C-alpha cells in the first residue's frame, strides 16, 4: 500500500533529484500573504527547475513570475509531482489539475468541480490531485509525489498505485541534467544479440525497435513490441506497461527507465532548449482556484 504515513516518508528525505534524463514537474503554490484577500490561495504550474521557479514567482512579473501570483505572495511551493516522461504529458497533467471540471479524464468525479464549503484552497487542490493519481493514463506513470513543506503533509484519501513514490525534501537540478549533449558521458557499449530473445526473429532496424535490460550485465535483446507484450502479460486491455521482470535475468524493470536507457544509447540530445522556457503565458497558466465557486450546503 502506498498510502501516506509521515513515518514512512521520514526515511525518504531527499535534498536533490539526480535524474539522468529530464525533470518535468507540476507544482502547487500556497500564498502566505498577510492580506486576507490572498492568504491561503493556491496556484498550479509546470516547471523544469523548481528552485528557480519559486524565486521568479516571489520576485514578480518583471523577473519571470506569473501575472496572477504577482503581488499576492510571498508564495510557498508546498508540493510537486514529477517523473513525467516529457513536458507534453506534464503539461496535460497540469491542465487537468487546473481545470478538473473540463478534463474528460475526471468526468467521473463531478464533486471535483467545486470547492466544498469551509474547504481550504489547499485541501481542494489536494483532493483533486488524490483523484487524478488513480486515473489513467497518470496512474500508470512512474510518478513521485514530493512534499516540499512538511507543515502541509497529510495522508492521501486513497492508496496510490504501488509503483508511485511519496517522498519529502527539496529539489535541485543536478549538474548532469544541465550538461550539454556534447559533454555528456556516453553509456558503456552493449553486446546486443542479432535476434529477439522473445520472438526469435532477426532484429530489423534495431536502432528504432530494439530494447534491452537496465542491468548492464544482462544481454537481453528484444523488439520493443515483444517486450511490451511480455510485460503486459498480466494486464490485459493495456498497451503500455508499467514494468515487470526481465525475461532473462529477472531484474525488476521500469518501462520508463527502459525508454530512457534507449535514448541514452542512441545519443538522442536532451531538449535543453525548453528547460528555461517555462515563463510564457501558454505554459505558466494559473489554476484560477482563488475564483472557484463553492458548493452550497
UniProtKB/Swiss-Prot annotation:
Gene Ontology cellular component annotations, sorted alphabetically: Slx1-Slx4 complex
Enzyme Commission code(s) on record: 3.1.-.-
Gene3D superfamilies attached to this UniProt entry: GIY-YIG endonuclease, Zinc/RING finger domain, C3HC4 (zinc finger)
Keyword DNA damage: yes
Keyword DNA repair (UniProt): yes
SMART domains: GIYc (SM00465)
Residue spans, zinc finger SLX1-type: 196-249
Protein keywords: DNA damage, DNA recombination, DNA repair, Endonuclease, Hydrolase, Metal-binding, Nuclease, Nucleus, Zinc, Zinc-finger
UniProt-annotated location(s): Nucleus
Single Gene Ontology BP annotation: double-strand break repair via homologous recombination
A GO molecular function held by the record: crossover junction DNA endonuclease activity
Entries under PROSITE patterns matching the protein: GIY_YIG (PS50164)
Ranges where the GIY-YIG domain occurs: 22-108
Cofactor: a divalent metal cation
Chain spans, region Disordered: 275-297
Pfam family, one: SLX1_C
Function: Catalytic subunit of a heterodimeric structure-specific endonuclease that resolves DNA secondary structures generated during DNA repair and recombination. Has endonuclease activity towards branched DNA substrates, introducing single-strand cuts in duplex DNA close to junctions with ss-DNA.
Self-association state and partner proteins as the record states: Forms a heterodimer with mus312/SLX4.
HAMAP family reported for this sequence: Endonuc_su_Slx1 (MF_03100)
PANTHER family: STRUCTURE-SPECIFIC ENDONUCLEASE SUBUNIT SLX1
Family membership noted in the UniProt record: Belongs to the SLX1 family.
Protein known as: Structure-specific endonuclease subunit SLX1 homolog
Source species of the chain: Drosophila melanogaster (Fruit fly)
Gene name in the database record: slx1
Amino acid at each position: 500500500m502506498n498510502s501516506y504515513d509521515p513515518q514512512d516518508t521520514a526515511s525518504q528525505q531527499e535534498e536533490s533529484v539526480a535524474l539522468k534524463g529530464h525533470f518535468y514537474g507540476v507544482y502547487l503554490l500556497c500564498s502566505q500573504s498577510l492580506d486576507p484577500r490572498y492568504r491561503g490561495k493556491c496556484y498550479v504550474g509546470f516547471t523544469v527547475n523548481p528552485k528557480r521557479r519559486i524565486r521568479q514567482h516571489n520576485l514578480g512579473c518583471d523577473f519571470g513570475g506569473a501575472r496572477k501570483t504577482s503581488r499576492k505572495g510571498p508564495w510557498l511551493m508546498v508540493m510537486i509531482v514529477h517523473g513525467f516522461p516529457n513536458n507534453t504529458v506534464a503539461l496535460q497533467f497540469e491542465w487537468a489539475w487546473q481545470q478538473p471540471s473540463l478534463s474528460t479524464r475526471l468526468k467521473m468525479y463531478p464533486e471535483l468541480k467545486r470547492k466544498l464549503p469551509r474547504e481550504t484552497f489547499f485541501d481542494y487542490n489536494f483532493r483533486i490531485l488524490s483523484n487524478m493519481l488513480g486515473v489513467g493514463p497518470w496512474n500508470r506513470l512512474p510518478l513521485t509525489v514530493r512534499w516540499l513543506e512538511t507543515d502541509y503533509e497529510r495522508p492521501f484519501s486513497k492508496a496510490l498505485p504501488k509503483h508511485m513514490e511519496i517522498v519529502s525534501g527539496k529539489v535541485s537540478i543536478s549538474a548532469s541534467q544541465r550538461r550539454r549533449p556534447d559533454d555528456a558521458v556516453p553509456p558503456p557499449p552493449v553486446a546486443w544479440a542479432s535476434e529477439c530473445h522473445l520472438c526469435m526473429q532477426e532484429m530489423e532496424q534495431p536502432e528504432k525497435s530494439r530494447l534491452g535490460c537496465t542491468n548492464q550485465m544482462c544481454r537481453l535483446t528484444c523488439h520493443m513490441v515483444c517486450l511490451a507484450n511480455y510485460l503486459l502479460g498480466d494486464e490485459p486491455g493495456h498497451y503500455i506497461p508499467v514494468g515487470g521482470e526481465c525475461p532473462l535475468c529477472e531484474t525488476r524493470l521500469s518501462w520508463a527507465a527502459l525508454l530512457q536507457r534507449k535514448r541514452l544509447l542512441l545519443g538522442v540530445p536532451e531538449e535543453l532548449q525548453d528547460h528555461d522556457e517555462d515563463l510564457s503565458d501558454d505554459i505558466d497558466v494559473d489554476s484560477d482556484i482563488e475564483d472557484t465557486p463553492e458548493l452550497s450546503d
